[in-house]
Structures are given as C-alpha cells and as structure tokens.
Amino acid sequence: MKKIIIILLLLFVVGCEFNGANNEVKTPKEVIETKKENQEEDYINNSVNELGEVPIMMYHGIHNKKNSETDYTGGNVDKDGYQRTVEAFRNDLEFYYNNNYRMIRLTDYVDGKIDVELGKSPIIITFDDGLQNSIKVTGIDEKGEIIIDPNSAVGVLEIFKKKYPDFNVTATFFINSGIFNQPEYNEKILKWLVNNGYDIGNHTYSHVNFSNVDSTKSEAEVGKIYELLDKNIPGKYVNIIALPYGSPYSFEHDNMKYILNANYNGKNYKTKSALRVGWKAESSPFSKEFNPKFLKRIRAYDNNGEEFDIEMNFKLLEKTRYISDGDVDTIVIPKSKKDLLIETSKSVKVY
C-alpha cells in the first residue's frame, strides 16, 4: 500500500512539472503588447502628410473679460489683437481641439520629435512678455504650492488638461526681466511651470528692438535673461528666443549672429531658434524649407477672417497642415512631396 502511495505521489509531481513546462503562465509584466503597424490604407484614409505646415500660435495677455466687454471684434482687447479675453482664449482652445490639433512642445518641434496620434496635427502655443495674467498667483496653499487664478492663461490650460487628457496641453512662455511681474512668487512660478509640463524661453531683458542697437547691447539683452534663468531653473529652460517686435525682421541682419551666439559676463549662450511675429504657419521640421533659427508664428487674434487672423490661417491649413502617422520615429509623406524631404536618419515611408 505504501509503495502505491509513493508511486502516485511521484506521478503527481512529475505531472505537475510536465504541465508547468508546457503551459507556462505569463504574468502581466511579461506580456508584451504588440502595436498594430499602420498600412498604406491608413495613411490614405487619414491624408497623412508629415511635410505639412505647423501652426505656432503667438499670444500675449489673457484678460479676465467676456468678449462683449471689449470694444473690438472676436475677443480682442486691443486694436491689434495682441491681448485676448479669457472667453476668446477658451474658444480658441476648443477650436484647436475640435479640429484635430494636438499640442506639442516647441522644443520638440524644432528637434523633429513630433509625437501626435495618427490623423491628428501638431500645434504649438507660445506667450510673450511674461505678463501677470499669463499665470496669476492668488496665494499659497497648505502644501506650499502656488494657487493659480483659473482665469489666467495657465489656469485655463490646466482646466483643459483635465478636460481633454489627449490634448497634450503645454506651452512655452517667453519672459523679460520682470519674469511674471509677481516678485514674491516669480521663483516659485518658474519652478512650477517647468515641473508641470511647460517651458520657459528668452524674450530679452528689456524687450529691446534689435534693429536699433549694436552687437554689444544685443548680446547683453540675450545673455542677461539666460543668466537669470540659470540662477532660477538651471538646465530646465529652453534656449529659444522670441524676438521682441519680431526684430531685427531679417535673418540676414548683422545682429542675428549675436542673438544666436551671445557672449555675456564671460559666458557663451547659444540659441537654437528665434521666433518672429507673423504671420503664417511654419514648415515641417523635415522639409528643406525649414529654418529652425528663424521661425514664423501666427498672431492669435480675430479680424473677421482677414489679415492672417486665426480664421484665415486655419482655412489655409485645411489643405496644407501637417498630419501625423502616429509614429514619432517614422516620416510618412505623399509621393508628390518627396522632393521636399531633407536627408534624415528616421525611417521614411512614401505612399
């Protein structure tokens, strides 16, 4: 009887080992999801074109007003449309989202790292002047974190971040010497922004017009802001400048070389991109027409569909926009565009 029991136990153990070897159960960590590779049909159905144009939107102030409370059209607070109501800004963001635009970081665009889902288009949001209504702080909470006015630009963006998680909300803020004009909070604001998915760039120390100054002044205007950023958020800002007034207006201007390669206080500051003021969408970073050192922006304002306002520009973009294939490491373009493609180490698909 004992022999029978021992034999049965041995058979049970061997059986368990045999089944375990041939019916191995993988834990969730061991299961690798395979991503479906897009086919030519997907590119055709979504009109994929990664040599299309990308809108870089230029904002300044966002004012806590309704559109009906201004003297100007479509939410403009001033006659030139550099200042917008918070109602207009919310409407702008809804428009971008509903028209299949998804935000990306400006620095990622410059570096050709456009990570947008299949069939969607990248859009870049920028703010100049470091105005208080870009990120108005109303106090400090019990955890020591800043409390942001929900009607300031960042307050609105944070609401949209929660409302539309796939919007990939981000923006780049270009500051002058006043930073965000809230001395008691400026350092906390800078750190909060870079820790919460936003970028900080250079808008010169005194909002200088580069057309009217010499090389020494040009270098100082650029260098002072980089020095300030090095002090407050070392290694966490972007070496991109938004040119005040769009000056010096021409890439061939003598001061451009000092803007892009400034020496100040014994330190060299290299700037990889300079942003202009107007007026249209910019080329794909994979296009031969792309010059990362002198980029166009779209003034975010309303002018009844004229003078390159938001409405006019986005109508033009209906035929020319960058449409993603959903793979950051692959460039997909129509055959008709292949002659515009730069030499690249990325995988390229032509359909």
Write out the residue ranges for each language-model feature.
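C-terminal motif of bacterial Sec signal peptides marking the signal peptidase cleavage site
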Residues: 13-15
